[in-house]
């Protein structure tokens, strides 16, 4: 057994999972959690893995990518998924939990492991030696300052401002056209043209749609040069036509005329399966957001794989800074895990902690770190955050659009998703004993 200790900073979903994975591999863990000594604006207890928003860990079926990632984690002995399964409450096809019981169960499993020592103190400097930073979206100001210094100002962010992303296969290609403004460079955007009547209908729905109430600690984010589309719209209908929906230089090749307004979609992944809606960062609730977006010509039946969000979130530019092992490129024994890496969601955060924990344990035991292939859900997330375009990097949920393409194209969505799931679970079984 190695005598080296791994520091894990933060006992949220990612940190708890990482600590457990390290400990079960016979390596000592020093798990730092500043609560209850210092609370965050969103947490209410001193328990590990406290769910601060919904009590749902989303879909539990294999027809959904987040269901596949859960099944992969079950096979890899995830403490988070084990606790969730034990504390589940009825939720149809989703995995929802009794949040208090769930946090208590995770705390018990992790705290009681003989290889885990819990330190209830705030860390303000990045420690020497093997370390996983899993401090989450509400990282304390002192540690944030340290991380900003480590990563560089341009690679450290304090909030999400992400536009919605849709599956290309769900776009009505008969209603959109490929073109760049003024035909500059290659035709890189799908353009959704609107008549004045279509724009008016869209505009009225947008300004009437319900938004997510801002938490007190999130109120500063709109003053940093990134305005939600509904706030722009509230300043007058022409704000959009002269802003993100301006049609100049985007003549419709079918009519030869310039539309009244245009919504542009930009490719979001290397495989060309996902497109983001340019300039549409939003604070709308998800139900109204879907209704509004489906008023855009070509997006009437759009499958939204990530809704637009604007919220407080501390995260790094992982494509520039991390390897798919969750190691920091400039320091082999420093790992990042959780939402800080740009994975979005409870399950995705825990999954990143699982892989970071495994690799930290392997590192101190003198073994090679593991890269999971992108045919797996966990591998596709690690690949996304480290190989996507660094310039437009924004956090992302698990979705089949991130998986490596299937060898054979399958038209029916249900069958295609089943093929992704089957392939992923076959592959992950090769890694269950690492």
UniProtKB/Swiss-Prot annotation:
Gene Ontology cellular-component annotations? cytosol
Q: What are this entry's molecular-function GO terms?
A: flavin adenine dinucleotide binding; tRNA (uracil(54)-C5)-methyltransferase activity, 5,10-methylenetetrahydrofolate-dependent
Task: Spell out the reaction equation it catalyses.
Answer: uridine(54) in tRNA + (6R)-5,10-methylene-5,6,7,8-tetrahydrofolate + NADH + H(+) = 5-methyluridine(54) in tRNA + (6S)-5,6,7,8-tetrahydrofolate + NAD(+); uridine(54) in tRNA + (6R)-5,10-methylene-5,6,7,8-tetrahydrofolate + NADPH + H(+) = 5-methyluridine(54) in tRNA + (6S)-5,6,7,8-tetrahydrofolate + NADP(+)
Q: Which domain of life is it from?
A: Bacteria
Single biological process term from Gene Ontology: tRNA methylation
Query: Where in the cell?
Result: Cytoplasm
Q: Name the positions where FAD binds.
A: 10-15
Q: Which cofactor does it need?
A: FAD
- Keyword annotations from UniProtKB, A to Z: Cytoplasm, FAD, Flavoprotein, Methyltransferase, NAD, NADP, Transferase, tRNA processing
Q: What is this protein called?
A: Methylenetetrahydrofolate--tRNA-(uracil-5-)-methyltransferase TrmFO
Q: Which organism is it from?
A: Bacillus anthracis
